[in-house]
Amino acid sequence: MLRTATILLCLTCALPAAAQRDSTARTIAIESVDISGRRPMKEIGVQRTELDTLVLRENITASLADALATGSTIFIKSYGRATLATASFRGTAPSHTQVTWNGMRINNPMLGMTDFSTIPSYFIDQASLLHGTSSVNETGGGLGGLVKLGTTPQVGEGFHAQYVQGIGSFATFDEFLHLTYGGARWSSSTRVLYSTSDNDFRFRNYNSKEFVTDDNGQIVGEYYPLQRNRNGGFRDLHVMQELYYTTRGGDRFSLAAWYLDSHRGLAMLTSDRNKSKQKKNTQDERTLRAVAGWERLRHGLKLGARAGYTYTDLRYLLKQAPEGKGRFVVNTD
């Protein structure tokens, strides 16, 4: 009886294993499948590159410049975090690159460029590149191309919250808060990003040579000093509010507002021998962007209208002692 039970138990364990081997080894031959689609008339001849949303959400400390450098072929010229970062397509300058946010151009009106270090990747839901003349369908003046940025309505009902924090070296802190609400008619999204850092790293200054003298004042040696980065701290605050409302008749109204408050120190020249902490070189920026829109899709016909507003207060400050006698003078624009 015991021998019979043992044999039955072994057969019971062996049958599933054999079935599993057969199922994994089984192959099914199917006929070829053709997948076809129609390209809209306005997309014919358009060279477009879509940026993966995973790249935009990869790192809280990343700006849009980092995301473009990682996920696209566009050339990004950057001097480090919280410093000027520009984008240019092949064979063109940064001023030839147009940038739109929800359909509104955000290029600097003075130089025509856009500082991508002031655009957090967490604030962008959709990003695409239109190369060369492909940008004429969206905006004009883009000899090199267009960087198209946008936000999308909240999908799903209910209230959701997301909080991400990052901590780095040299007293660097990043905090991101995202609050969303979705209902039958209304949807809302609130994003807040706050970044701050002392950015006082140590480096060997090869542009400043120190000499070692003996008791008689004769030079007996020399070395390159180890110094800290002065005046390189930054503080960035971003707040974005979005509201969407859909009527029963199919009309959708939207409002998106983005406020930026930035204070950035411009690092001193490595050849500057003035070590006084009173010397300052800073750039402050306060920018407000707002876009209101209306869309209607009915009977295969899409109508829409948008209105945008932008305001920028950019101030540069230089506090120095031009005579070298300790009398510091403030120069500002």
Describe each PLM feature range.
Residues 104-132:
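Short acidic/polar hinge/loop motifs at secondary-structure boundaries
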Residues 169-196, 208-263, 286-288:
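Transmembrane beta-barrel wall of Gram-negative outer-membrane proteins
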Residues 30-61, 86, 94-97, 127:
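N-terminal periplasmic "start-of-domain" segments of outer-membrane beta-barrel proteins
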Residues 94, 154-156, 183-186, 246-250, ...:
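Outer-membrane beta-barrel channels and translocator barrels
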Residues 201, 230-236, 246, 250-299, ...:
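Flexible loop and strand-edge segments within Gram-negative outer membrane beta-barrel domains
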Residues 65-108:
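Extracytoplasmic beta-strand/coil segments of soluble accessory domains associated
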Residues 159-163, 188-192, 253-255, 301-307:
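Transmembrane beta-strands of outer-membrane beta-barrel proteins
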Residues 68, 127-128, 147-149:
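Non-catalytic regulatory/gating segments with a bias toward low-complexity or hydrophobic composition
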